[in-house]
């Protein structure tokens, strides 16, 4: 798997890889493989995970938390982006504000995103769906 990822990324010219911090240990293995093969390595960004209030990674046990489900329920995109922005350190985490994609891109810097995992709370879900 690790070899395939490294070769595939190199063939596609991947320069940046953004993934969850649960895959941080893969970066060292992939770096070693790329070096051994004489390939350039991408920059890796390992972001915090989103967890449920029980501290566990989001899963079916937390209900349907897929973006597509929120979209189907009529949740405006700006609310989802606003919640993500609050987890990324924009504004008050306890009081997210709707935000469009352009504002998110202009405001959020990947290097300043908090390293602690985000927690999807019942209050967050209520805020998303109260529109």
Predicted regions and their residues:
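Non-catalytic terminal extensions that flank enzyme cores
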Residues: 56-58, 64-131
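Active-site cores that bind ATP or allylic diphosphates and position pyrophosphate for catalysis
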Residues: 1-59, 66-71, 121-131
């Amino acid at each position: 798997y690790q070899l395939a990822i490294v070769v595939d990324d190199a063939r596609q010219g991947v320069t940046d890889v953004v993934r969850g911090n649960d895959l941080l240990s893969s970066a060292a293995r992939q770096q070693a493989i790329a070096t051994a093969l004489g390939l350039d390595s991408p920059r890796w960004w390992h972001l915090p995970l989103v967890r449920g209030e029980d501290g566990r990674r989001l899963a079916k046990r937390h209900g349907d938390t897929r973006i597509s489900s929120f979209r189907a329920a009529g949740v405006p995109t700006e609310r989802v982006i606003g919640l993500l922005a609050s987890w990324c350190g924009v504004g008050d985490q306890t009081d997210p504000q709707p935000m469009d994609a352009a504002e998110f891109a202009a405001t959020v810097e990947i290097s300043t995103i908090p390293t602690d995992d985000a927690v999807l709370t019942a209050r967050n879900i209520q805020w998303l769906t109260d529109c």
